[in-house]
Each structure stands twice: as structure tokens, then as C-alpha cells.
Amino acid sequence: WDVPLPLPELWEAVKWAVKPEGAVLFFAQCPYDKVLGASNLAMLRYEWVWYKSRCTGFLNARRAPLKKTENILVFYQKSPVYFPQFEQGKPYKKIHRCSGNSPNYGKFERTSGESDGQRFPGNVLAFPTVTTTVHPTQKPVALCEYLIRTYTRPGEVVADVCAGSGTTAVAALNTGRRFVCFETAPAFYGPATERIRRAREAVASGRKGE
């Protein structure tokens, strides 16, 4: 988490291990997110922005703004499955007042629209920051669940090459996905393994892992 990934080797491994329709997501902050995105512009598609409940970067507060967001870069070779997680808004019925002629769209007739209040998601995701952590950059389980539901079907495999505290594995268990996780740091491997074990037990008993 504190050492940049070797990008050429990373992308070689991604193309070998991930099917062309698989989505590849990375959490990253400036300036590394720019380096990461530029390292594979052919696969870079767009980004989500995680809006945190707590700021970070207090040691640099007199030199730079506190960090309230973190970017999530999305890469893929071919379009992956995409299941937008709809947000609930206010239902409405709308009728255009009259027919007309637009220089951009030509002639149009009076039409009506109706919505049950469901809205397509924007790219800013507000999830509370984890307060009690195993890993310094631990992500919220709910945020990882959101991303897993967006890009995978139940029963599919989710992989995390920087597993840290095991949040991705817990989120995969909670959403009915399988997982493959990698972590090389002994300080995190043990606690993550125990956390995943507890999550398995929770899911097996009808609860959610934490």
C-alpha cells in the first residue's frame, strides 16, 4: 500500500488473468492516480470518486487542502457487465407543454414522462470512512459491495491483488461472489485471514460479514 506497483508487470498480469470483459478497478490518490491512468490509456475508461466522511492529510494541512475524496479508476478491454445501483429520488410525471421544431433535433411532438423515483447513479459515491481499521488504507465494506454488485454477477470471481485487511473478500462473501485475494505483508495477512473466517461464519448463519 505504501510502495507503487510495478506497472508494466501489473498490466501484463491483468491481461493474462482477467478476461477481456472483466472490469479492473484501482483506488488511487493524486499524483499516483495520474501515473496509473496514463500507464494504460488504452484500457482506462472513467473514474468513480469516493467522497469520505473524514478528511485525511492533516500533516500537510498548512500546505495543501485536506483530502476528502479518493479516485477509483476503471479499466477494461471490452465492455463488462454493468448493473447500475439505482438511487431513490422523488417520483414525478412530466408533460412537455407543446410540440415544436428544434435546430438540433428537428420536429418533435408533445410527450410525457413518468418516473418512480429511481435515478441512475452519478460517479460520486458517499460512504463513511472506516474508523476502526486493520490496515491504514482500509476501505468500507459497503463501498466494495457497491462496486462488486455493479460489475459482477452472483457466483462470479472477484480478485484483489492488494488485499490488505481483506475487505474485498468480506464484500464478496456478503454479495454471493467467490474471491481470490493476495497479501504479502505478514502484519496484515494474519488479521485479514481471521476477519475473512469470521465473515464466512456470519454469512453461513444468515448475517453479513464486517
Where are these regions (language model features)?
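Core catalytic lobe of class I
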Residues: W1-P191
